[in-house]
Amino acid sequence: MPFQKHVYYPLANSPEGPDASAIGAAPMAFVPPSAASGPLPFFQFRPRLESVDWRRLSAIDVDKVAGAVDVLTLQENIMNITFCKLEDEKCPHCQSGVDPVLLKLIRLAQLTIEYLMHSQEFLTSQLNLVEERLRLSLLDYEQSKQLLTKQAGEIKLLKEECKRRKKMLSTQQLMIEAKASYYQCHFCDKAFMNQAFLQSHIQRRHTEDSHLEYNTKAQTDRLQKEIDMLKEQLQLTRSQLESAQHSHAVRFSKDYEMQKSKEEDFLKLFDRWKEEEKEKLLEEMEKVKGMFMREFKELTSKNSALEYQLLEIQKSNIQIKSNIGTLRDVTELREDHLPCPQDFQNMLQLLDSQASKWTDRFQVLNEEHSKEKGQLLSHIEKLRSSMMKDLSADNVFYKRRVEELGQKLQEQNELIISQKQQIREFASKPYSSISELKGTPLTRQTLEPKSAAPTTPMTASATQNLDGASSLTMVHEQVFSSHILEPIEELSSEEEKGRENEQKLNKKTSLRKPSSTSPSPQELRTNLERELGNKLRSFGIGANIQGIPCEILNRSLKAMQVARHDLAKQMPDIQQIRESLEHQLICKMEEKVSLSSDRHHVPSMTTFPPEEVPKATQLPHKSRPLVRQRTVFTDKVSVPKLKKNTKESHFLRRFPSTKTPPFSSEEEPDEEDLLHAYLSPDSLATAATQPPKSSMSHFGKSAVKSDTDWTEGSEMDDSDFSPKLTGTSITIQTDTVETMALPQGSGNKAVPGMNPADTVIKKESLQELKCTDADDEDWDISSLEEEKSLGSKIEQREPPPAKRDPSCTQVQRAWGPVNPREFKEEGLHENEPSTLKSNLVTVTDWSDVLDV
């Protein structure tokens, strides 16, 4: 090949002589990258504008180059020789130009060299094109060869398939032509013309096999059924495995994507670090290069000064000769009479030492850079391994955590299902059994004030009914349902006698079981506080938190409103059900109020001190009418502001806190757990002793609030477990029932000094005092402090009656023991015209739990 390493070398059998071949063996020029892309443009000689580097030419030994075939030296000087300009060159001695004949010869040689360089580039480009075509043709040949072998294999397979198909077709044709005249024996290879011959053959030759055939058929059928069943099971397990594999693949792909993103981020950081290191290295290289250039400039300046001195010496010593002779004399003088050869040697040694010094320094810098790079790479690998270990540990921890949470969630779901099943069982039983199951001991304790047993607080099972996975809105709804009272319905005389007999029979069991099984009130309080604290911690509420933030409250209330709207969409007739139930309840209350007012008329009464109340006014336990509790959901009824006065005038005939819940009666046992209320006579006595604080207009405003506003405010107060709700939703109902039962409870004996109109005014003022703002957002104020402050203000404004029991001026906590004397001394006081206060059911003061 004439081209080796993109350099043109002429062939050995060229017509030129050995000198020409030696000269032509020099590499002319490297092939530019644009030469292989296509044909070269039109050739044109370049102008000569470069000056001759005489110093470089004088350093070349031509005989040595020709003898050693030093192509590299020729390659280094080919551009200067080809494109140098000799017209302006003058003799340093005579200052005359170059000989024209010699100049013409040199120009022809330059043009020849340039043309040869152009030819070399063109031939190199053509050679590259031919090599590329050859490579493509070889690739096509390999592909065609592979395709040919593949097609030969396919042809062979097709031939075999054709042979097999031919055999199959021939056998099928024979079977079709034979039709029914061909009968094959199942036990041997013999064939018969008809079925009779086949049967005789089987009886004669295969008697035992025929009996076995029937048995084998049954076995094969049974095995076939088992195989089908196993196939179905296999298909089911295969589908399960595919679904599990798909989920695993999805999880693995997610993990892989996360890991890949992390690796990409890490690679980006690594690339950024590499770029920074490259920039630093380039800066150092630039600094070293600048230093080299400065030293090189200094050396060139010194060298130029020495050359100038040398030229001055030559001008003074050499005579003027002809043009050609002067050139030869100059070279001879430079070779023979070199001024100061010791200085040149010193200069060369200095240059060599500096070059070796800088090369050593450069090598040291490269080694340091490689060491730092290796250290950083090892550090990166360590970081990556540690990161992977941490990620694996975190994954194991989170998987374990997810499994634990899943188990807890499953247990809670099972608990919820069991509780709902119990509620359904209670709902399916008769009403009397439900009342006995729910709170027979508790209601009997409230109805028999002679017993000295303390009021049993709410057990920890009520708090356990709250689901740990439910939201805060469900907690508010459950707490709201616990504060709803049941109306009191009077019984007939026969029912009273039957109930009294039943009470006498079950008195010991109903009263002794709570006292024997239930612990003391202090222990119950501590247990309830502990259970409540654990449940609040499970909801993420710490012990130091004094309330729920407004954002969480608003969000939970919005979620509750959305749920109610969805329920209203699912049941379009829910509003009609509410209105019908409300109408029925109001009608019943009006009938009972009218009947009681017609039969009993109360004359003007006089008040007695608490110690001087007659025995007739103090109602004993046996003379008090028994009550039957009925589960009724209560709520406020929105009243327009224009009818406020009419509503206030008929306040005794209306039941102001009556409303159906936002769900049907069928869903009541499944949706919410009703919490039993407990007796708090001291709190009722305190509420009765407090005089009115504001006018009746305040109660009207509080009663006029809309449906949604009341529910939001009441639930906000219920979440704090403060007794404010008992003032709004319980006391009004209590006073209304008291005014109904007043004539019956007094036993038709009038107490002098009391006016029914005054009683109504006092009851309305008491209702106004108990109505609180439902939209109050101050969750941390205790109801106990409010009632104490109200009691102190009342004492400042109006002096209490003489010989008043001090226990009535402050609210007794529901957790404390009940004083038996309070049941006996409870009668008609100044602000207590009703005798049924001890029989009413109130809500436990939950604020005590939060205060602790």
Swiss-Prot record:
It is found in: Cytoplasm, Cytoskeleton, Cilium basal body; Cytoplasm, Cytoskeleton, Microtubule organizing center, Centrosome, Centriolar satellite; Cytoplasm, Cytoskeleton, Microtubule organizing center, Centrosome, Centriole; Nucleus. GO terms for molecular function: BBSome binding; molecular adaptor activity; zinc ion binding. Keywords: Cell projection, Cilium, Cilium biogenesis/degradation, Coiled coil, Cytoplasm, Cytoskeleton, Developmental protein, Differentiation, Metal-binding, Nucleus, Phosphoprotein, Spermatogenesis, Zinc, Zinc-finger. Disruption phenotype: Male animals were all infertile. Few spermatozoa were collected from the epididymides of the mutant, and no motile spermatozoa were seen. Light microscopy of the mutant spermatozoa showed severe morphologic abnormalities, primarily absent flagella as well as residual cytoplasm and abnormal heads. A zinc finger (C2H2-type) spans 183-206. Belongs to the DZIP C2H2-type zinc-finger protein family. Residues 1-351 are annotated as: Mediates interaction with GLI3 and localization to the cilium basal body. It comes from Mus musculus. This is Cilium assembly protein DZIP1.
